[in-house]
Amino acid sequence: MNAFLAAMVRHGQLADALQLFDSSCDRDIVSWNTLLAGFARHWCVQGWILWRRMVREVVGADGFSFSTVLSGFAASASLASGLQVHAQLVKSGFGDDVYVGNSLVEMYMKNKCLADGTRAFTEVRRRDVVSWTEMAAGYLHCGEPAKAIGVLSDMMLDGVMPNNFTFATAVNACANLTNLDEGRKVHGYVIRLGDDSDIGVKNALIDMYAKCGSVSCAYKVFQSMQQRQVISWTAMIMGFARNGRAREALEVFDDMLLKGIAPNYVTLICVLYACGQGGFVDEGWIYFNAMADKFGVEPVEDHYACMVDLLGRAGHIEEAEELISRMPFRPGVLVWQALLAGCHLHGNEAAGRRAAEHALALEKNDPSTYMLLSGMLAGRHNWEDARRARGLMTDTEVMKLPGSTWFQSTLDRNQACIG
């Protein structure tokens, strides 16, 4: 029965697997763990129901069971359920299992419980490379990139060699800090100790060098890759675009298409952004209009926001407003902020006020809208209204985010697909 169960789980036939499981009279711990692992891979409420059923039927969970269910709660960011399992773990006697300990660290860190995650890490007696990598990834996830980088040296002092996942995490932390010196150090470790051909590490290096302003180094890494994923091409396109080399970004995209690589929706966000940075209005329209028919990607709000930004930067405010009016769904905050940014740039106060009204009606606590509105009004020497806009920020207790823009929020939401 377990062999059939494993085959069903492997092929994603979870409903059939559960039916077979329920109809069987000779279930053992392997049966439970197999089904639990299947639900953990696509974690949903059924996984939690199965775990509670396992506890209720007094099935003796083992280390694999605890590790699996904790990883599931890490993936679903379900802290309350994870705490219940941790309490059961304490009574079980499997607390010393390194796999269970690693999953416990992962569960706390992905729920942004840094202190609890650190405590769980210190209680892992025989830490392996997964333990340290989970800790580095946890620090990064919790907004502590400097500590994530520090894990790399700490683990080597502890006699544990990093793997490619550790290196990629450390490189991403350097990118987060835009710390080129640390990024180069980590790259040196990769060359000496790791697999310099690993695609994931190289993707992270491209993103890091580009974010640190060393796009030539990013391109060298890109050129050295024997195999490239869509993420690789996307990271390089974005690297050129964000460093003022929009034409080269589009040349990379053209090369991507010539090699038969299909772009995804994030790639096309970066292509449209590159058009905006370069002022390539006609090309932007060509790419935007070809999205659905040629690339099989239906434009979403991020793509419309990029097109509005492109038109706004070029001073085509009326054309941008006309595009917004033709959107097949309700424009979101990003679209109106993109229009407001264009109005700020070209001093179109009337359209800018309209854009700000729409943006604030949708999200009154977004600092970007207030800053763009205030900047536009100040640029028109409308000091009183500019002060009033800043006063509204204070009245609504909006915190100014340094360097925050509508496009940065787009990148933040899609970062997993870029770097």
Regions found by a protein language model. Give the residues of each.
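Terminal (and in a subset, N-terminal) low-complexity or junction segments at the ends
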Residues: M1-G419
